[in-house]
Amino acid sequence: ILDTQGLRVPTGQVGLIHVHQPAYADFSYVGNDDARRSMERSGLKTMGDLGYLDEEGFLFIVDRASDMVISGGVNIYPAEIESVLQLMPGVADCAVFGIPDGEFGEALAAAVQPQPGAAIDAAQVIAFLKPQLASYKLPRRIEFVCDMPREDTGKIFKRKLREPFWSGVARRI
């Protein structure tokens, strides 16, 4: 587990997961050599997952580095909020992501797909999350969607959820 400078992080601290995999297939991103180089460091490779090792050496995956939100200088991992929100009655699916914020750089937004026939509103979502999360982890904006945009693999396509909020914004965090 390495920090952004490529140094090992202490036990329990979140960093970028790197692995040594000699049988890893050699590939390149067409027209983007920097993307390939960013995945490798001193013979180690990363797929962009964040995690930490506990005192017994067990690995805990926290989130994807590309999904992390930095709000007011604090790193927030959307997967933590999503795991709580998915427990809310009436929620079929959800995604949490960063949107521009003039004061903090980024703020949290949640896209919520209600279960068929469920009637939930933003106030109920916040009321459900509030006792379980720190206040800075509460989404400032709740959007309700009929269907989540999905990649071919079935994963939620968060970039499509973020894009409308970031269009016209010069700086993307």
Q: Which residues make up each language-model segment?
A:
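Short Gly/Pro-enriched turn/cap motifs at secondary-structure boundaries
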Residues: 8, 39-43
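Short secondary-structure edge/capping micro-motifs at helix/strand boundaries
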Residues: 35-36
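AMP-binding/adenylate-forming catalytic core of the ANL superfamily
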Residues: 5-10, 16-21, 27-28, 50-137, ...
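Short proline/glycine- and acidic-rich turn/helix-capping motifs at secondary-structure junctions
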Residues: 143-153
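Hydrophobic/anchoring residues in structured secondary elements
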Residues: 1, 96, 143-144
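Acidic/polar alpha-helix N-cap and adjacent early helical turns
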Residues: 163-173
